Regions:
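Alpha-helical transmembrane segments of multi-pass small-molecule/ion transporters
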Residues: 1-239
């Protein structure tokens, strides 16, 4: 029974791209389905996701980052040097509206997430290296994301880097630290919770995506062609 439940959880998690498309369609057709989630719930949802990620990490994971400093350093530098500049170039070349330009640059300035680790696992790549890169870039993002967003997007709209910094501390660093501590002192319960955390993370991401699309329905429908094109170019360029 437990094994079957685990298989269902993995299946539901691996179908994340499909759920994202379905949620996007529902949010644009029937916005009320997701507007209840609310802006204030986004930070809470992201915090829970980072808490779940922290519960899968141990002190050894942090030590492993330093065992391949050149590879990790190259990955982190590529993440924060190439992607933000690429996002800013796309926003400028495609003349995106200010809100979309800032959003694209912010996405380009963020670290890799847990979804990248899942993709590496499915591709039978080096999962340990992917986790190390995600961990290193997440830590670096505490300083780099506010700085780069302010630098590249500040002329579109006012960007408060210190507010971004404080938000990342509360939403990323604090729950991540709590999760690591939980795994350190209460490994059994952390292991049990970690079995469900990927699915919980997927559900929360879907709620966040659904709310954002529902909340910005008019803007998205008015600019869907240029928005879709810019996001696809950003991610294809990242690969």
């Amino acid at each position: 029974m437990v094994l079957m439940l685990g298989n269902y959880i993995r299946m539901g998690t691996n179908l994340f791209p499909l759920w994202s498309v379905l949620v996007g369609i529902i949010a644009l057709v029937e916005p009320k389905s997701f507007l209840w989630f609310g802006k204030d719930s986004i930070g809470f949802g992201l915090g829970v996701i980072m808490l779940g990620m922290g519960m899968t990490l141990k002190a050894e994971d942090f030590i492993r980052v330093w065992k391949e400093p050149k590879v990790i350093g190259l990955g982190v530098c590529s993440q924060f040097l190439i992607m933000p500049a690429w996002g800013a170039l796309i926003a400028y070349a495609m003349k995106l509206p200010p809100e979309m330009a800032v959003g694209l640059i912010l996405v380009a300035s963020c670290p890799g997430g847990t979804a990248s680790n899942v993709v590496v696992f499915l591709a039978r790549g080096r999962v340990a290296l992917s986790v190390s890169l995600t961990l290193a870039s997440t830590i670096a993002a505490i300083w780099m994301t506010p700085l780069l967003t302010s630098w590249y997007a500040g002329h579109y709209l006012p960007v408060d880097p210190w507010a971004l910094f404080r938000g990342i501390l509360l939403v990323v660093l604090l729950p991540l630290t709590i999760g690591v501590g939980w795994n350190r002192f209460f490994p059994k319960s952390a292991r049990q919770a970690s079995a469900y955390s990927p699915l919980v993370s997927v559900l929360l991401i879907l709620l966040i995506v659904g709310f954002v699309l529902a909340d910005k329905k008019e803007l998205i429908l008015e600019n869907w062609e240029i928005l879709t094109g810019s996001v696809m170019i950003l991610h294809f360029g990242g690969f």
